[in-house]
Amino acid sequence: PGHQDFSEDTYRTLMAADSAVMVVDAAKGVEDQTRKLFHVCSLREMPIFTFINKMDRDAKNSFDLLEDIENVLGIHTYPVNWPIGSGKEFKGVYDRNSKKILAFTANNGQKEVEKKELTLDDPALEDTIGYYHKQDLFDEIELLDGAGDEFDLEAVRNGQLTPVFFGSALTNFGVEPFLEQFLQLTTPPLPRETVDEKVEPMSDFFSAFVFKIQANMNKAHRDRVAFMRICSGKFEKNMEVFHVQGNKKMRLSQPQQIMAQEREIVDEAYAGDIIGVFDPGIFSIGDTICSPGHKVQFRGIPTFAPEHFALVRQKDTMKRKQFIKGTSQIAQEGAIQIFQELDAGMEEVI
């Protein structure tokens, strides 16, 4: 949130996701880019899980943050845990399910702080969080239980209710409980709409769509990877597939799963998995790949209207070929859009 160049690439990634994590800055509340991307999620009725971050810094009132999310984004909230203080007075979070307090200790420059569990009737509670924080916590729990929304898993999975968690990612406080709950509450791979039908993830035939293309990920040599989301069936290394937009059969070489700088060659993958395959320049964003015996075509991924324009021309006319190839490749990756006059060449483009 807050990054101005964030939306289109993130939008395409959201098209491949089944649920989303919304990170909200506790000091700023909902930002403009969050609003834009949330709109995309709500159109798809995606489950959204909210993590309110930076509680160890000065923050807005927790009730105001929930109200901000509900009013600005139009989604109901259910705090799964509740913060005790904020900034220098941040003492931890209370888990409403387990009825336990996860106490926060000052990190003194450490990347991960020590965690201490307490119950509401623990004699050490007052010494740990302080008398006033204890009284505030009891009052706020009573208010949440009496006036807050009830937890409804079906509403979460329909994108109508967002579970809210508080913590501090920098000190890794509250992150692990959040991820554990996320795994329990999020949906399995969901069905996908095609032009003619709805494809179920447990279908026997293989289908996938390309949502991202990235060049030069390997510094050792120029490469180009097409990332695809598998929607149904089982993918196997070197299997024959049908490229719908190219109208031809092909074999996908070097399938891999990528995590940051790490690459791992995969022999098989299933619905919900993301794989990257070598792209010799034939794939475009939104393309469908499927089993030759069962052809489907997923709906394309819309593009955003451009916001920044520039007139581009090559300095060296002897390098026209490289200029055309380079700009075309960047356009295929979805980073830019190219406009040119009808019947005009590529000497000068927008």
Model feature map: region roles:
Residues P1-I350:
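Structural and coupling elements of P-loop NTPases
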